[in-house]
Regions:
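Conserved N-terminal glycine/acidic-rich loop preference
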Residues: 165-168, 192-227, 237, 241-280, ...
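Serine-esterase "nucleophile elbow" of acetyl-processing enzymes
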Residues: 56-123, 185-192
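Oxyanion-hole/transition-state-stabilizing segment in secreted/luminal serine hydrolases
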Residues: 73-77, 128-211, 243-246, 341
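Short amphipathic alpha-helices and their capping/turn segments at secondary-structure boundaries
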Residues: 53-64, 148-167, 221-235, 362
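Structural recognition of the beta-strand scaffold that forms the well-ordered cores
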Residues: 61-73, 115-120, 164-169, 174-176, ...
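Charged, often glycine-rich, active-site loop that binds/positions anionic groups
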Residues: 120-150, 305-322
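Secretory targeting and sorting signals
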Residues: 2-56
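Mobile gating loops/cap/lid regions near enzyme active sites that modulate substrate access
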Residues: 246-277, 284-347
């Protein structure tokens, strides 16, 4: 196994209290219990499938599923490279956490190595993991007719009884968190209704935040059930979202596009406490119910949000620093980050943010493989 630096070992050790094993549900929710029981027979049937070997004799099989917070988007080099015929519009990159973790898991334990199949895709929803074909929307050198649809990630990853570990980072797009940020940005630039008011008492045709979270919970239950059915012998690890918003909305510089732009301070506080934290809690609650492992990357990233200065932030703001191939304008909107010599980053982790997530996910995978 490749030697690790003292700093790397310390970083891994510091995650011990942040990665919780699966277990009983801390806050029982009747609907969650009813839905999970509904899929229980299917999972029980999966358990009766004869167990195969842990994988090929010389390797463990790890599948990484998820959205842009897993794929990377603008962090590092595109993977596959620009110009490669196999590019699929999913914006996976070399410095996103799956690739970072893969490099750290070379020959672990001695005599075996971890083989990564990364099928994460920008803009993926929970449904895109398990059920539906996704049409990628990468703005980077799209083909003339647009990107062709890709199969559900469970299918793309070819999950089976030889899969040892599955990591999943998804949920934000099903909640439509990115769209909520843009709506909050729009409402913040004009007097009138706040973002909180808009989503707690929404207009006709718009879901309330309460309904959004309930729907995400139901979708997550169904998705995890299908992952277990597809990979009955795998250790399943879910990954939450980092602290992209500050602990105090007033910490943000209003109108600074490198932070959260025109979003009102009170709405930032609402987005943090009533949207982002409940989303993570929902993911953790469902994960615990299935007996899987949840990786918390929120706590360790507090103080490194989008409103921190460069060098401290682990999340870029509405506009931010990104690789040269990434666009400075957001198609279909008036957002133009070129005016401040930045690129459109829409509150996504930078390389430091992915490195933090990688340390936590790496430790969770090591534990999972030792228990396999």
């Amino acid at each position: 196994m490749r030697p690790m630096s003292v700093g790397r070992l310390a970083a891994l050790a510091s995650t011990a209290l942040l990665v919780r094993p699966g277990g009983s549900m801390r806050h029982p929710v009747s609907r969650l219990r009813m839905r999970a029981l509904a899929v229980g027979l299917a999972l029980a049937a999966s358990a009766l499938v004869p167990s195969g070997s842990a994988g090929a004799a010389d390797q463990y099989e790890w599948a990484a599923l998820g959205d842009s917070y897993t794929a990377g988007g603008f962090v590092g080099d595109p993977q596959p490279p620009l110009g490669d015929a196999s590019r699929d519009g999913c914006d996976r990159t070399t410095h996103a956490y799956p690739g970072v973790v893969e490099g750290e898991l070379e020959e672990f334990p001695p005599g075996k190595y971890v083989h990564l199949t990364n099928v994460s895709c920008g803009n993926a929803t929970i449904a895109d993991i398990a059920d539906t074909k996704q049409t990628p929307i990468s703005p980077v050198q799209p083909p003339a007719g647009g990107w062709p649809a890709v199969d559900p990630q469970i299918q793309r990853a070819k999950l089976n009884d030889q899969t040892d570990v599955v990591t999943i980072g998804v949920g934000g797009n099903s909640l439509r968190f990115g769209g909520m940020l843009l709506k909050c940005l729009e409402l913040g630039a004009t007097p009138g209704k706040s973002c909180r008011e808009y989503y707690t008492s929404p207009p006709e045709g718009e879901e309330s935040i309460k309904d959004k979270l309930a729907r995400v919970q139901d979708e997550y239950i169904g998705m995890l059930a299908k992952v277990h059915q597809a990979a009955p012998n795998a250790k399943v690890i879910t990954v939450g979202y980092p602290a992209v918003l500050p602990e105090e909305g007033s910490a943000c510089n209003r109108l600074a596009l490198t932070e959260l732009g025109a979003i009102k301070h009170a709405d930032i506080d609402w987005l943090r406490d009533d949207v982002l934290k409940p989303l993570n809690s929902t993911i953790q609650r469902v994960t615990d119910f299935f007996g899987d492992r949840y990786v918390d990357v929120y706590f360790s990233s507090v103080g490194h949000d989008a409103c921190q200065p460069a060098g401290t932030k682990w999340v870029e703001g509405i506009c931010g620093d990104a690789a040269g191939y990434w666009p400075a304008k957001l198609p279909g909107t008036l957002l133009n980050c070129a005016v401040i010599h930045k690129r459109v980053t829409l509150v996504h982790p930078n390389a430091e943010g992915h490195a933090n997530t990688a340390a936590h996910v790496e430790r969770a995978i090591r534990i999972a493989l030792l228990q396999h």
